[in-house]
């Protein structure tokens, strides 16, 4: 048998140490735990009218439990966004609709701007995904209007669902 030089012995020892180190890494590896992340969707915070800093004369928030709506049997919500071109086109029809139904005592018409932070709870509650959206709240159900946004069709929708 041939004698190994000191350089070969050092290389063999280093190779053995390297192999043992790799085996220990593979076998004794700690499980990787994900780091804590802040949830992407923050819990919604409902602003009560008496707790915010907005002057009550300027408040435009309406909630399903608002005392203003409790004496009204029916509420027609119009969800819009000022930057939406379809909402701008529909605004004249909405104004005529408000004038036509102004004299009906048990119907309240509410215009809700989806870009205002104080209306976020309504947008979430009624699951508003697009604007303009019209929802008629009756004593027993909520009806989303999906037809033509003409004055005649909306009037027919309101009258037919109020006379059930």
UniProtKB/Swiss-Prot annotation:
Disulfide bond residue pairs: 84-87
GO cellular component annotations of the record: host cell membrane; membrane; virion component
Database matches in InterPro entries: PDI, Thioredoxin-like_sf, Thioredoxin_domain
Pfam families reported in the protein's UniProt record: Thioredoxin (PF00085)
Record-linked SUPFAM superfamilies: Thioredoxin-like
GO molecular function, one term: protein disulfide isomerase activity
Domain Thioredoxin: 36-163
GO BP field: protein folding
Principal location class: host cell
Keywords annotated in UniProt: Disulfide bond, Host membrane, Membrane, Redox-active center, Transmembrane, Transmembrane helix, Virion
Topology of the protein relative to the lipid bilayer: Single-pass membrane protein
Compartment(s) where it occurs, according to its Swiss-Prot or TrEMBL record: Host membrane; Virion
Sequence intervals crossing the membrane: 8-28
Keyword Membrane belongs to the record: yes
Coiled coil region boundaries: none
Family: Belongs to the thioredoxin family.
Protein's name in the database: Thioredoxin domain-containing protein R443
């Amino acid at each position: 048998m041939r004698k190994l030089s000191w350089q070969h012995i050092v290389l063999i020892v280093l190779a053995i140490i390297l192999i043992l180190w790799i085996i220990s890494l593979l076998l004794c590896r700690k499980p990787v735990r994900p780091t804590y992340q802040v949830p992407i969707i923050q819990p919604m915070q409902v602003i009560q009218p008496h707790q915010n800093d907005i002057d009550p004369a300027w408040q435009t928030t309406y909630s399903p439990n608002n005392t203003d709506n409790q004496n009204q049997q029916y509420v027609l919500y119009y969800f819009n966004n000022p930057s939406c071109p379809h909402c701008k086109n529909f605004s004249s029809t909405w104004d005529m609709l408000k004038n036509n139904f102004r004299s009906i005592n048990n119907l309240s018409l509410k215009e809700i701007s989806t870009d205002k932070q104080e209306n976020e709870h309504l947008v979430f509650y009624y699951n508003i995904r697009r604007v303009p959206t019209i929802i008629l709240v009756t004593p027993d159900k909520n009806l989303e209007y999906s037809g033509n946004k003409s004055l005649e069709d909306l009037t027919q929708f309101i009258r037919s669902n109020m006379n059930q």
